[in-house]
A protein has these predicted regions:
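A short, conserved alpha-helix within the catalytic core of class I
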Residues: 127-137
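Conserved SAM/SAH-binding beta-strand->alpha-helix loop
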Residues: 78
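Conserved class I S-adenosyl-L-methionine
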Residues: 1-43
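A short SAM/SAH-binding and catalytic strip from SAM-dependent methyltransferases
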Residues: 117-129
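Conserved SAM-binding loop
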Residues: 85-86
Length: 213
């Protein structure tokens, strides 16, 4: 799915990518992403392969490669984010250890290889067919499957309703949603993975990690 036709590729443009990259270089990973990274490192990432779906500027890729992961694959609909991820990868000396695929993971899934670790950082909540996304991505995880999703609280739901209203008024096609964690859990367990870590970070985010049985 090309960024010129994908609502995600169009919405997450160069302005977003530049701001995210600047923030990452100045402050490092945000608290929720850092929590997932630390949980993955606690399980062991040395020599591991990573599949990072919708990873934006590639924060998880950069951090795990710096911590001993062998290789990473980034699948992203936004060409602006892919360019920023490549730029940061080159700057960190990771060129040759990262493969990039431009498009919708669900559409590309058959051509995307499995990896020891699969991550989706704030992706499930903005993808229309979340169950298919989770099912296909969980099946690619040989060892660990980590996701970050909005907490299922009244406050978060109200924020998302307001955000979607603004997006509608701006004529954007991107929408967000709160997907109940137990619904995600059922799909992930069907793929043969079990919960090994769960933590709330701030008022909005839930960080969850699964391990293959």
């Amino acid at each position: 799915m090309d960024s010129t036709t994908s609502p995600y590729g169009t919405f997450y443009n160069e302005k977003f990518a530049t701001a995210d990259l600047r923030s990452y270089r100045k402050k490092g990973p945000n608290p929720w992403t850092r929590t997932l990274i630390e949980a993955l490192k606690a399980e062991g990432v040395e020599g591991a392969t990573l599949l990072d779906i919708g990873g934006g500027i590639g924060v998880i890729q950069h951090e795990l490669l710096a911590s001993g992961a062998a290789r990473a694959t980034g699948v992203e609909t936004s060409s602006a984010y892919l360019a920023a991820a490549r730029e940061e990868s080159d700057r960190r000396g990771h060129t040759g250890r990262v493969t990039y695929q431009h498009g919708d993971f669900v559409e590309l899934a058959e051509s995307v290889p499995a990896a020891d670790i699969v991550t989706l950082d704030r992706v499930i909540n903005v993808y229309p067919d979340w169950a298919r996304l989770v099912g296909l991505s969980a099946a690619r995880a040989r060892r660990l499957y980590g996701v970050i999703v909005p907490r299922d609280t009244r406050f978060v739901r109200l924020v998302i309703v307001a955000m979607n209203l603004v997006l509608r008024l701006q004529r954007q096609r991107v929408r967000a949603a709160v997907v109940p964690l137990d619904a995600i859990d059922r799909v992930v367990r069907e793929a043969g993975l079990s919960l090994c870590f769960s933590r709330t970070v701030g008022p909005a985010w839930q960080v969850v990690l699964y391990r293959r049985d």
